[in-house]
From Swiss-Prot:
GO BP, one annotated term: glutamyl-tRNA aminoacylation
UniProt keyword annotations, A-Z: Aminoacyl-tRNA synthetase, ATP-binding, Cytoplasm, Ligase, Nucleotide-binding, Protein biosynthesis
Organism: Aeropyrum pernix (strain ATCC 700893 / DSM 11879 / JCM 9820 / NBRC 100138 / K1)
Function per UniProt: Catalyzes the attachment of glutamate to tRNA(Glu) in a two-step reaction: glutamate is first activated by ATP to form Glu-AMP and then transferred to the acceptor end of tRNA(Glu).
Name of the molecule in the record: Glutamate--tRNA ligase
Gene: gltX
Amino acid sequence: MGSEDLERLLLGYALRDAVKHGGRASVGSVMSMLLGDHPELRSRAREIASLAARVVEQVNSMPAGEQKRLLSEQYPELARFEEQREKGDKGLPPLPGAVEGRVKLRFAPNPDFVIHMGNARPAIVNHEYARMYKGRMVLRFEDTDPRTKTPLREAYDLIRQDLKWLGVSWDEEYIQSLRMEVFYSVARRAIERGCAYVDNCGREGKELLSRGEYCPTRDLGPEDNLELFEKMLEGEFYEGEAVVRMKTDPRHPNPSLRDWVAMRIIDTEKHPHPLVGSRYLVWPTYNFAVSVDDHMMEITHVLRGKEHQLNTEKQLAVYRCMGWRPPYFIHFGRLKLEGFILSKSKIRKLLEERPGEFMGYDDPRFGTIAGLRRRGVLAEAIRQIILEVGVKPTDATISWANLAAANRKLLDERADRIMYVEDPVEMEVELAQVECRAAEIPFHPSRPQRKRRITLCTGDKVLLTREDAVEGRQLRLMGLSNFTVSQGILREVDPSLEYARRMKLPIVQWVKKGGEASVEVLEPVELELRRHQGYAEDAIRGYGVDSRLQFVRYGFVRVDSVEDGVYRVIYTHK
């Protein structure tokens, strides 16, 4: 980044800080904002601090009105953010250097498994920014490691399905394994420019770099290295015998940054790729492929986890080599979902080592998007929680209670109410003044016109939960009448609702015997799956698989399957 661009950035941050703090900006705050948005500048922090001090002094000498005017005119996105903050609006902060209509972002999953809550964060955040700036969104499958991160053929479509369910759409789609010739072309150009070379020292090459030395081929000219690269492509080297390295600093304090590997040989006869089989032997590493594609696809902003900060430094080496302008890099903290496993490797291990115990990648005990969907969590709830967390650099843990609260608020407006009893007790009905009574119960309190009619007559049987059917207790059957529990009989007392209110009677759910549906409730509790048996009212038969319901006084559930008249539902939350 040139000095003029740097000074302009510092001026924007200083104006924003001054407007936020009554006309006074501080060097510390300005540097924090700059390095948070541009971690690649951290190595120049000492040099930049003196420039920041001059810019802050300049801004602090301005009248407050002038500060606001300059911020609004020259940095409208930063000004908009301050306006949102003053109003208390929640939302994502502005992107540095963003121009409406020219922002382009990407979500780039590895299709070695389905996506989980942690992966959903960059997908949703990038998509939201693309919408905010009327920009474009790219979906890019990063599948260039068939050896250690073997792609799954089915994962491509499963990821697409999960993204669509989350409301994430994209304008362009790419699969890196289908772009191999592009990577070869850029590798050749990097070698021609003298900033990449073929290390054919095998295992010794890595050992040399660990001592701050290097393979002698580093000192060869571009022509010789290009010849070696063509031999790699033609299969004259075996896996592990030769790699292409970016020329960085063989004595860099961080060994992983010393002439890192850009291309390597993978024996695809042993490790075939699910899309291209054994067509290619030489494969780009993650950092090389990402750098090339982010440039070729004109990505303006890269938003990803802070675990990629070291990768950012590696990728900048490619940009410097090729003379490309890098995108803006923004790193946010890791995201955890309390009580759920998000690790792909751990989930795969559980599925492999404990077959038959879990339902698959979409088991409701897992934090995969498919698992949360199967549990009954709505996409809107996930999106809402992730946007609230935003792009903060600190790690964040979402509690299940918070996600459930967001989901409950949405479900409460949508889910029909169904009566369900667990651990049932059969009771006989004895009405006092009439032979029969009819209950008209709305499926949803806000839509009273949709209701079911259930008629009970003297001698009919009903099912109550054991904890409600306490001897001598008075209670009200929902929508019907008031009763006393007496030796297996429900004896009607005053039928009025006023009586129930005056006596503060519990209003309980009930199921008429004879039309009941068998229900199995699966309750996920961390890695345990508790099973409960009960009965639901006949009205449940109007709902199919994937219906979200509220079992009255029990909780929200999602219908997972209906087999032989038995409804299997998954307990979502209270």
